[in-house]
Amino acid sequence: MAATLSEIRELIQSLTKTANEIKAMLERNSAGKPTGIEEAAAKIIKDIGDKIDQCECTKKIEEMLDQKQNADTQIVPTKQESSGLVKYSYPNWNVGNEELGSSGNPNAVKWPPRK
């Protein structure tokens, strides 16, 4: 179902024209009494809402929310924050800062040099 650019352009132009016509009708009929367009829009919104309510995924979400026992329980677990300072996972024998970890190699290069 591939559409060419010309087909898409024509579709966009027709949608733009329809949208402009709807805007003009709404501006003319903004006196406060409901029009056929507003009634049709309300029906469409209600139908979409009903379909969402009947969806299995909505029922599953509602069940999961009902199973939630207290405010501390989370449905989706949060990622634990890692500390900003991570120890090296490979041997860096006394290289760098002491806080970053070291295996204690006595022949390692140390900075700043010690006498």
UniProtKB/Swiss-Prot annotation:
Task: State the source organism's domain of life.
Answer: Viruses
Chief location of this protein? virion
Q: Which Gene Ontology molecular-function terms are recorded? A: DNA binding
Q: Which sequence ranges form a coiled-coil region, renumbered to this chain?
A: 1-28, 33-54
Record has Cell inner membrane as a keyword: no
What is this protein for, i.e. what is its function?
A: Plays a role in virus cell-to-cell and plant-to-plant transmission. Interacts with virion icosahedral capsid and movement protein, thereby facilitating virion cell-to-cell transmission through plasmodesmata opened by viral movement protein. Also interacts with aphid transmission factor, attaching the virion to aphid stylet when the animal feeds on an virus infected plant. Aphid saliva may later detach the virion, inducing release of infectious particles when the animal feeds on a new plant.
The protein depicted here goes by the name Virion-associated protein
> What organism is this sequence from?
Figwort mosaic virus (strain DxS) (FMV)
